[in-house]
């Protein structure tokens, strides 16, 4: 009897996402969910009153899974860690509660979820750095401060792209994201545009292209905020995670 070749039986199994990556994936899911609700709420859109229910239920389940991933890390208790878990529990509750409401209120209940999930990701990364040296390998593509800021804004659901008269434009909310930066991220496989997936900029206007992180973008950003802070030459500083205190340039 001929032994079948084993080459075709060998394959790489992707490792499970880290807690930080899982929270970033959760933020992306909330962005997609909110965009879907925005499209349903467009003037003249005809949809079932509970069209959002299945998606909201999946988000509540995904949030509870993220909470378990965080608690499974067995980090030492701290006020910051406790606050992060509470925020995630609140997200799970709001997602679940949104199923009992019609679209306008349901959209309101998850409006801030992407930013909250990203804030939790940053907090967990900080706790892991503080409690033990990170084992995260440095990504092949080292992020510049500008790229890191742009990836953070994208992950929070703050960046969309449009076209007008043959030109491309990027619209952002907190930190500035230039079209050149977006193109660089796309060229490196870290970000992508989803055509006509985000709400219009004005009533009756065309849908915009949502900019989202790719799997590689999530991995690189998670690694960037998870690595221990090391000494740097004078005059160089790490790029801080953007905060909501920056003046908004684009309304929700």
Q: What residue ranges belong to the model's regions?
A:
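Short, amphipathic alpha-helical interaction segments positioned at domain boundaries
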Residues: 204-243
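Short acidic, hydrophobic short linear motifs in intrinsically disordered regions
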Residues: 158-176
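Short alpha-helical segments that sit at the start of domains
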Residues: 125-157
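Short amphipathic alpha-helical interaction segments
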Residues: 171-199, 206-208
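Long, low-complexity or tandemly repetitive, helically biased scaffold regions used
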Residues: 35, 39-108, 131
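Eukaryote-specific long, low-complexity intrinsically disordered regions
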Residues: 133, 137-144, 193-194, 201, ...
